[in-house]
Amino acid sequence: MSSTFSGDETAPFFGFLGAAAALVFSCMGAAYGTAKSGVGVASMGVMRPELVMKSIVPVVMAGVLGIYGLIIAVIISTGINPKAKSYYLFDGYAHLSSGLACGLAGLSAGMAIGIVGDAGVRANAQQPKLFVGMILILIFAEALALYGLIVGIILSSRAGQSRAE
């Protein structure tokens, strides 16, 4: 029986696993960060409702993490087309490592943003001078996810380089 598939038949599994890992882990980080910092905003809003809109920054920053995972998942999934060109294990592993790099970086950044955001908005309600410090810490936590996104893009661009075509 003839097949139009070219390459290693198990390789797309690893590629799609990388796309799923990028999205799932990044969204887990985004969900945790949103929930944890959202609880802080809600509890702070009871005493100081005028600060709610100012304190929504950690929630927004946590939500962006899911977008990073979506970007990598789309890049990976568009690179998996075994019928158009050969797709080997090297390509699958490159896409898997790309998804894991972005996803796990997003998960860790989401945990950091959630914890810092929760404590930061509560502290900001008591001492408004802490707002700038909280934002700086949140930016450094968000940078962790950006590192994962950059490494994920670099790793996914390596797919297809194992052969001379």
From Swiss-Prot:
Output this protein's name: V-type proton ATPase 16 kDa proteolipid subunit
Which source organism does the UniProt entry give? Gossypium hirsutum (Upland cotton)
Site Essential for proton translocation: give positions.
Answer: E142
Location relative to the cell: Vacuole membrane
* Pfam families for this protein: ATP-synt_C
Stretches in topological domain Cytoplasmic: 34-55, 118-129
Per UniProt, what is the membrane topology? Multi-pass membrane protein
The entry lists its GO molecular-function terms as: proton-transporting ATPase activity, rotational mechanism
GO annotations of cellular component type:
membrane; proton-transporting V-type ATPase, V0 domain; vacuolar membrane
The record's similarity note reads: Belongs to the V-ATPase proteolipid subunit family.
Q: What InterPro entries would the database entry show?
A: ATPase_proteolipid_c-like_dom (IPR002379), ATPase_proteolipid_csu (IPR000245), ATPase_proteolipid_su_C_euk (IPR011555), F/V-ATP_Csub_sf (IPR035921)
Q: Which domain of life is it from?
A: Eukaryota
Lumenal domain ranges by topology: 1-10, 77-95, 156-165
Described by its record, this protein's role is as follows: Proton-conducting pore forming subunit of the membrane integral V0 complex of vacuolar ATPase. V-ATPase is responsible for acidifying a variety of intracellular compartments in eukaryotic cells.
Q: Give the CDD domains listed for this entry.
A: ATP-synt_Vo_c_ATP6C_rpt1, ATP-synt_Vo_c_ATP6C_rpt2
Arranged from A to Z, the UniProt key words for this protein are: Hydrogen ion transport, Ion transport, Membrane, Transmembrane, Transmembrane helix, Transport, Vacuole
User: Which gene specifies this protein's sequence?
Assistant: CVA16-2
Quaternary context: V-ATPase is a heteromultimeric enzyme composed of a peripheral catalytic V1 complex (main components: subunits A, B, C, D, E, and F) attached to an integral membrane V0 proton pore complex (main component: the proteolipid protein; which is present as a hexamer that forms the proton-conducting pore).
Q: Provide the transmembrane region boundaries.
A: 11-33, 56-76, 96-117, 130-155
